[in-house]
Amino acid sequence: MGKRFVSLHAICIALLFMAVSCDQTFDPLQKNEDLTFSMYGVVDVHGQFSVVRVMPIGERLINTDPESNNSQVFLIHNSTGDQIAFQDSLYKFGGDTYVWNYFSSEDLSANSSYRFVAQNSEGRSSVAQINLPSELPIPTIEEYSTGFESGIFIGQSVDPIVSVKTRYFVQPVNEIGCDPEMEIVISHLDQLITYADGRYRLEVNNRSEISAALGPSVENFVINRRELLIVSSGEDWPDLSELIDLEITLPDVINNVEGGVGYVAGVAGRIIQITTPQEPC
């Protein structure tokens, strides 16, 4: 299995994004013999955000061992039995802290139920039941100004929109050339206007936020990519509105994993290129 470093944003775009603390330790008095894996992430109808963090449950949820544990991770369609293998991806937080993310770019059947399964070399497994939402139509870019980084997006969704963000790949420019590319992500869920018939509308004005993210020392910059990231979900999406932060971090509070801990949600996601991408300078 290959080691591939991927952006954590693909996981964080949805779900509590690693609701359980990365350094959370299980209670040594708690019986964990029946718990095999912790699993957090999303499975996407359109295959653009299907990434799930899968870690063997040991003393801690994450470890310092970059070697593969020979886990097999796959998705099974409950009606047809069709199976899709997820590929592994080693993610390094920094120092010697490693986690395993598993991803797939396969399109899936909307409004269908699946089982997300992680199995270790001894045959023990953890399973999450997932209900996928309807397909998410691609929204329309009604207008966009690259000068002000402002625009209007409109669309329609059968299921509630649970995440909407703009993402920019930006390079500061100095007198001798360009600095390394930076990723800037701005959430707009609070700005989203939704209607009873499923239509939605989003207006953004991001120039000042991009400048603030770059810092006062950056006077000039180029934007190589501008993207709209939008995600919908149905009954699978957890309701955290009545939970306090401490409750969210407890493994048994938000959990749909049998034989393990965690939460894997079904979503429909789209990544829309707002303007034509260009190569870094």
Model-predicted regions and their roles:
Residues 23-281:
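A sequence/structural signal for flexible, mid-protein segments enriched
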